[in-house]
Amino acid sequence: MYTADAHCDALLKIAQSDSPLVNIDTLKKGGVGLQNFALFAPVESSIYEQQEMIKKEITLFHMCVKQSDNLHSNPFTFIKNDNTYTDAILSLEGAGMLGDNLDMWNDLKNKGVEMASLTWNERNNLAAGSSQPNRYGLTRAGKKVIQWQNNNNIVTDTAHLNEQSFWQVIELADTVVVSHTNTRALLDHPRNITDKQVAALVNKNGFIGLTFYPLFINGTNRADFSDFGRQVEHLCSIGASDIIGLGSDFDGISSTINGLSNPSDYPALINWLLARFDENIVEGLVGENFRKFWNRRRIKR
Ligand SMILES: [Zn+2]
């Protein structure tokens, strides 16, 4: 079945000379037709070091694509329902190292970045992340960057934002996703989203990627397919079945769902889901919803 994943941190792992769980072999075995690769630099390092890290990850991304027939990168073009290869897309997770320097944003777009979040969990010069109280939100510079994103058909990712920033993005941004999260209805964690936020994303024709991180799924270090299934069930019950998908966060999480240790395990998850949900729900969830969302906004350009 066509599978798509809206978030992984494999590039950081490769940049740190570690071997990623998301790689050519596991993508192939998992039937992954579409994989988003996030550019991320640890926020503790200096702005200069973060900029250098992002450059390094971009270079590594293009090297990987060049070296493998199985990875395709064609920014701003239509993505086919074909998982005999993987369409690799690029996003930026946290943009404190760019601030509102639009030359740098343009440069990133020219290198294939099509989606970006303003901040990680912290508060930076653009927005306030999920660790921050709601008296903080988007800054003037953050609003300017959203405007640039709208003008350049860049998707605004609200994963990691606090609620205040989220609602401001909903108001200002054209195309909004939460690339890797779970639901607060099932676990009240600052990285998860409320039913009200889900409804706003449905309204906006956005997208929600569900992570495999047990800490966000049930608050422990252990989760099973059934815990993941409960997230899906809840989202379907509040009318979000057409906008949900996978946002694994592989290579960015310290534990994962039992039986789902890397992309090669997707067929097992799919079989489990097919035994419990309608086929069209499963097809949407594991890939088609994200592919369609991505094509909708690419065509809009
Ligand atoms: Zn993240």
Q: Language-model segments: what does each one mean?
A:
Residues 239-260:
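Short acidic/histidine-rich active-site segments
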Residues 1-36:
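An N-terminally biased module of ancient metal coordination in phosphate/nucleic-acid-related enzymes
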Residues 100-110, 132-177, 190-204, 226-242:
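Histidine/acidic residue-rich metal-binding segments in metalloenzymes
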Residues 7, 27, 112, 156, ...:
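Conserved, mostly hydrophobic/aromatic
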Residues 2-5, 34, 87-91, 114-115, ...:
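Structural preference for beta-strand elements that scaffold enzyme active sites
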Residues 261-301:
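Mid-to-C-terminal alpha-helical segments outside catalytic/metal-binding sites
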Residues 7-11, 40-42, 91-95, 121-123, ...:
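Active-site beta-loop-alpha junctions enriched in small/polar residues
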